[in-house]
Design a protein with these regions (language model features):
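A conserved regulatory-domain signal marking ACT and ACT-like small-molecule sensing domains
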Residues: 1-182
Length: 182
């Protein structure tokens, strides 16, 4: 029987890092299922889901622990629970504005208050084309519960968007985005 494992990985970015990890998983009969990995600053960070034969799991865990000597921290845990059945609507939230502390905090406060689940979040700071000022950009994939009113959520987000001086758009993933006012 295969055991599903979810891992987090962090360490100084270097060539061959992912290959080392993939090699260890393969050497222990593991199957690499899905991952999200990137360089953040000078660090490499990732999340990974694998299946490994139950009898090879302890051996794999020891091999992953040995990566610490090469400056890579790996935390692995068994993912015994079944994946939750998705309910509600998938929605994409995009945020763009001048960078400042608290943008994600304020946006996620509204989302949590409406019972919205953040399924995926990616963000970055980039230089504005003309001014060179720092812009904050985020893309957030949301799972809206059936009880969540999209219009009400949009209204709440628009209220804080003007305070945060950001533009937001909220779109059903199956429909065209409707830009929010700033």
């Amino acid at each position: 029987m295969d055991i599903p494992l979810v891992m987090t990985i962090i360490g100084k970015d270097r060539t061959g890092l992912v290959e080392s990890l993939a090699g260890i998983v393969a050497e222990h009969g593991g199957n690499w299922l899905e991952s999200r990995m990137c360089r953040l600053g000078g660090e490499f960070a990732g999340i990974l889901r694998v299946h490994v034969p139950a009898e090879r799991q302890p051996e794999l865990m020891r091999a992953l622990k040995a990566l610490e000597s090469r400056g890579l921290s790996v935390v692995a845990c068994a993912d015994e629970s079944p994946a939750p059945v998705a309910t509600g609507r998938l929605t994409l939230l995009e945020i763009v504005g001048h960078d400042r502390p608290g943008i994600i905090r304020e946006i996620t406060r509204v989302l949590a208050g409406q019972g919205v689940n953040v399924e995926e979040l990616s963000s970055e700071c980039v230089s504005a084309p003309m001014s060179g000022e720092t812009l904050f950009k985020a893309r957030v994939r949301l799972q809206l519960p059936a009880r969540c009113d999209s219009a009400g959520l949009r209204e709440e987000l628009e209220k804080i968007a003007s305070d945060l001086v950001v533009d937001i758009s909220l779109a059903d993933l199956d429909a065209e985005p409707v830009p929010a006012r700033r």
